[in-house]
A protein has these predicted regions:
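Short N-terminal helix-initiation segments at or just after the protein's N-terminus
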Residues: 85, 90, 128-132
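Terminal RNA-binding accessory module
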Residues: 103-201
């Protein structure tokens, strides 16, 4: 709680946090030597969102971990649907030589792992679109990173890590340089990108 309150009150701290949860099933988390549980994860996320209503939470999940049953995966899907993370990536479990997980029973077929990965990503795609559509009409501060081939500017908000999160495509009537901060009105939204125009001073 002390750390959450520090984040909420510090003006120079972005309300963005990356928590690599990887799964929500209690048994799987225990086998991964994680101290967290489904209930504790939900409690932490709830406290973060209560303290910072605008917080954007990024996480990563692993689909097809050894021993993951159909029921376990269904729980993971329901968890992602309930939590509605602003940013989420998912990867199929990769068997790495020399790791404990590589020797565990219940290895999931590669095709099944990829199918489960695709299902979570399809779900997250709709969640991301929902979050982005809610931003249409808002004015957001954007960090300019460059220009597209058609002359549109490319940037990101304080809620987007470079290379992995959303981008903002926007127009401006003036010349901008990478590193500039501008106010952009969001006029359209896609799954993983926002479209806008600079607010004239």
């Amino acid at each position: 709680d002390e750390l959450i309150q520090a984040m909420a009150s510090a003006p120079k701290v972005c309300h963005y946090i990356d928590i690599p949860l990887q799964h929500c099933n209690d048994r799987i988390l225990k086998e991964m030597n994680r101290c967290s549980t489904d209930a504790s994860i939900k409690d932490t996320i709830g406290r973060l969102r209560k303290a910072m209503p605008d917080i954007h939470i990024r996480t990563t999940m692993i689909a097809g971990l050894p021993g993951e049953t159909k029921e376990d995966f269904a729980q993971l899907e329901a968890f992602v649907e309930e939590m509605k993370f602003e940013r989420l990536g998912v990867f199929p479990y990769s068997k790495e030589e020399g790791t404990l997980a590589a020797t565990m029973k219940g290895q999931v077929r590669q095709q099944t792992k990829e199918k489960r990965r695709d299902a979570i990503m399809a779900l997250q795609c709709s969640i991301s679109l929902e979050h982005n559509q809610a931003k249409v009409g808002q004015v957001m501060e954007v960090l300019v990173e460059g220009q597209d081939e058609d002359g549109s500017y490319i940037g990101r908000t304080r809620y987007d890590a470079p290379d992995v999160d959303n981008g903002v495509l926007f127009t401006s009537s003036r010349q901008l340089e990478p590193g500039d901060f501008v106010e952009v009105e969001i006029i359209d939204a896609f799954d993983y990108d926002l479209v806008g125009r600079e607010v004239e001073a």
